[in-house]
Amino acid sequence: MATVSSSSWPNPNPNPDSTSASDSDSTFPSHRDRVDEPDSLDSFSSMSLNSDEPNQTSNQSPLSPPTPNLPVMPPPSVLHLSFNQDHACFAVGTDRGFRILNCDPFREIFRRDFDRGGGVAVVEMLFRCNILALVGGGPDPQYPPNKVMIWDDHQGRCIGELSFRSDVRSVRLRRDRIIVVLEQKIFVYNFSDLKLMHQIETIANPKGLCAVSQGVGSMVLVCPGLQKGQVRIEHYASKRTKFVMAHDSRIACFALTQDGHLLATASSKGTLVRIFNTVDGTLRQEVRRGADRAEIYSLAFSSNAQWLAVSSDKGTVHVFGLKVNSGSQVKDSSRIAPDATPSSPSSSLSLFKGVLPRYFSSEWSVAQFRLVEGTQYIAAFGHQKNTVVILGMDGSFYRCQFDPVNGGEMSQLEYHNCLKPPSVF
């Protein structure tokens, strides 16, 4: 159950169990009212937020020296990390607000810190558009966790909201759709008027797993099915639904290519990653992260679907070479042909793979980058050739480069911490 309303932020409904919505004469802006150029950083507003008391002013001049003996403010805690759709930018939700940063070159584009409360657990970008989707979270949420707030940074306020009877787990955006993920249900809305287009029931989905294609025209949406280890693939252009039993264990993570043709999945075991064709559900390739169990934090395809990046709680980011574009289709996941090139190393005992366990005939990662264990990391491919961008929940930012021929350890190109004060950037 969801309700839609225009928002006159900063007065969100303080009751997270409420689904009431006030009527308003204002309408949700059409796409022509938004800045949608994906290659323009100027589409972001530099407007700062006001506090809940609009008449409140500071007694300190901007040119005055810092007041002595003030306690040092500790860095904020990160509640959320996500890349935008083309991995050119990333969003950070903290217990004080949110901030948007550019990957290459690394720089902070803007931040919005709230005076009181401020916890934001979901920040979903729409390429480099001024429109964001926000969900409150943390110990002192800025917005109720059962609401999706549509933020227009050009106006410096929320221009619409979607209310639900349970907490929002995640949000996905396309230029024409808003997808809201709850614990066991997914709602698909039209972007221009927030009209409900479709709803899907899923198995318990506390992580809010959902992926949506970004290609112009037909939309492909992937979400957990109703059974453990099952994924559901919705093809909206052809109005077809495909169910794939991807794993025996529960689904832990998945990712789509931009065009929605390929799907990568990992289970709660975290040892294998499988790549499927979304049209017919066939297994195209299987790669091995390792032999021991791991929690997979992120999967990401390169823009040309030649590489796949995987991050886990083991503190290592792996890059795998994919051969799905060669047309060789895997019918039996236990009989994956090894790639003779250095870009996809496999066991030298591959001649005996019909006899030896599958572990010895597995395809292993081409390149690796080792990080400190204990922090959650997500990874995506950079816009420069053979580069990977890694984000950590501790605020860390790494940009690395891998050798596609020789493989091995990636080289670190740069490191930053996105939680530093704005004067540092």
Curated annotation (Swiss-Prot):
Sequence ranges of the WD repeats: 73-111, 117-161, 246-286, 291-330
Pfam families from the UniProt entry: PROPPIN (PF21032)
Mutant phenotype after disruption: Mutant is more sensitive to nutrient deprivation conditions and exhibits an early senescence phenotype. Prevents autophagosome formation during starvation. More sensitive to methyl viologen (oxidative stress) treatment and accumulates a higher level of oxidized proteins compared to wild type. High sensitivity to salt and osmotic/drought stresses.
Protein name, entry field: Autophagy-related protein 18a
Membrane topology summary: Peripheral membrane protein
Induction: By sucrose and nitrogen starvation and during senescence. By methyl viologen. By salt and osmotic stress. By necrotrophic fungal pathogen B.cinerea. Up-regulated in response to both water stress and hydrotropic stimulation.
Function text: The PI(3,5)P2 regulatory complex regulates both the synthesis and turnover of phosphatidylinositol 3,5-bisphosphate (PtdIns(3,5)P2). Required for autophagy by autophagosome formation during nutrient deprivation, senescence and under abiotic stresses, including oxidative, high salt and osmotic stress conditions. Cooperates with jasmonate- and WRKY33-mediated signaling pathways in the regulation of plant defense responses to necrotrophic pathogens.
Domain notes: The first protein part may form a beta-propeller domain involved in specific binding to phosphatidylinositol 3,5-bisphosphate (PIP2), leading to the association of the protein to the membrane.
Biased composition (Low complexity): 1-29, 41-62
Biased composition (Pro residues): 63-76
Main location: cytoplasm
Gene Ontology cellular-component terms listed: cytosol; nucleus; phagophore assembly site membrane; vacuolar membrane
Species name: Arabidopsis thaliana (Mouse-ear cress)
Region span, Disordered: 1-76
Tissue: Expressed in roots, stems, flowers and leaves.
Keyword annotations from UniProtKB, A to Z: Autophagy, Cytoplasm, Membrane, Nucleus, Protein transport, Repeat, Transport, Vacuole, WD repeat
Alphabetized InterPro entries for the sequence: PROPPIN, WD40/YVTN_repeat-like_dom_sf, WD40_repeat_dom_sf, WD40_rpt
Assembly description: Component of the PI(3,5)P2 regulatory complex at least composed of ATG18, SAC/FIG4, FAB1 and VAC14. Interacts with WRKY33.
